[in-house]
Every structure is written in C-alpha cells, then in structure tokens.
C-alpha cells in the first residue's frame, strides 16, 4: 500500500468516525453522540447540526446521486428532530434511510422523511403519543 493510499483510507476512516459521513459512498451515519459519562442522549442539537452539514456537503459534491442514511435513535428533542426531517425532505437527492436497532419516538418521525425506507431484520420501532408545550 502506498503512503498516499494509506493516508486516503485513514482520512476516510477519520471522517466516518468523527463526522459520521462517508463521502466516497455518499453515506451518513445518524446516531447520537455518546460520551463515557452519559447514555444515548437521542436526537439533540449536535446530531441535527451534523446531519444538516453532511447533507449539504454531499449535495454540493453532486446533487443527483442518491444518499444513504443509517439511522439508530431512541428519540429525542422535537425541534431538533424536525430540523433533520426538514433537511432530508429539502434534499434534491434520493434519500434512503436504513433503520438499525432501536428506532423510537422522534426516530420514527425522521424515518418518514426518506424517499426509501429499509428496516433491518432485528430493528424495532416504538411510537407513543406526543406531548406539547408552549413557548412564550
């Protein structure tokens, strides 16, 4: 393996792990950012801003080619989830979402934004009545 090939593979691995995007394969990994001190926080600002940036990145590289999103989410904050939903719906590219593991609450709403949905054999969904609050 040449030094350049090694560096390219290392950069691709870094992007997939740190930024949750595989540019070469037009794939986004949509899951919560987990640290050692917390459980899965679900859909939050970090998750939504990362997804929106990655969608724009892939769209700017090529508007026509499809994008695949791998989703695993226990749910989360309504407004952040709707930001993800809107960003996916706004995309001119064909979006396929593949659901893994637990797709719960807001995760099920995000799944509906896709042009194509694939559910892995051992994935499970959880849907519940919504709650609302007023912002003054």
Per-region residue spans from a language model:
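Terminal-region recognition feature
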Residues: 1-136
């Amino acid at each position: 393996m040449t030094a350049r090939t090694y560096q390219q593979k290392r950069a691709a691995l870094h992007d997939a792990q740190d930024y949750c995007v595989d540019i070469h394969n037009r794939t986004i990994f949509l899951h919560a950012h987990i640290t050692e001190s917390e459980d899965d926080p679900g859909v939050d600002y970090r998750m939504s801003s990362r997804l929106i940036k990655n969608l724009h990145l892939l769209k700017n590289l090529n508007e026509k080619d499809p994008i695949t999103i791998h989703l695993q989410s226990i749910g989360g904050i309504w407004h952040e989830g709707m930001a993800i939903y809107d960003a996916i719906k706004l995309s001119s590219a064909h979006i396929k979402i593949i659901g893994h593991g637990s797709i719960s609450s807001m995760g099920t709403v995000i799944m509906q934004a896709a042009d194509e949905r694939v559910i892995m054999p051992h994935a499970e969904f959880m849907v519940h009545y919504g709650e609302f609050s007023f912002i003054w």
